[in-house]
């Protein structure tokens, strides 16, 4: 997973990632997440996205 962009939108952090299979995802989090929790969440989402079948 590559976090290639991080910015604030309406006060909340937004992370744009590229997964192992080169899919692009934007995730908006609230302020209650720590950096460690956000990284764990992004890692879980990456695995789910990489295993999804796109039709």
Swiss-Prot record:
Pfam families listed in its UniProt record: VraX
Protein name: Protein VraX
Domain of life: Bacteria
């Amino acid at each position: 997973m590559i976090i290639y962009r991080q910015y604030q939108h309406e006060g909340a952090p937004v992370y744009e990632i590229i997964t192992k299979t080169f899919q692009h995802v934007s995730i908006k989090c609230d302020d209650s997440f720590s950096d460690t929790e956000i990284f764990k969440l992004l890692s879980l989402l990456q695995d789910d996205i990489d295993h999804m079948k796109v039709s």
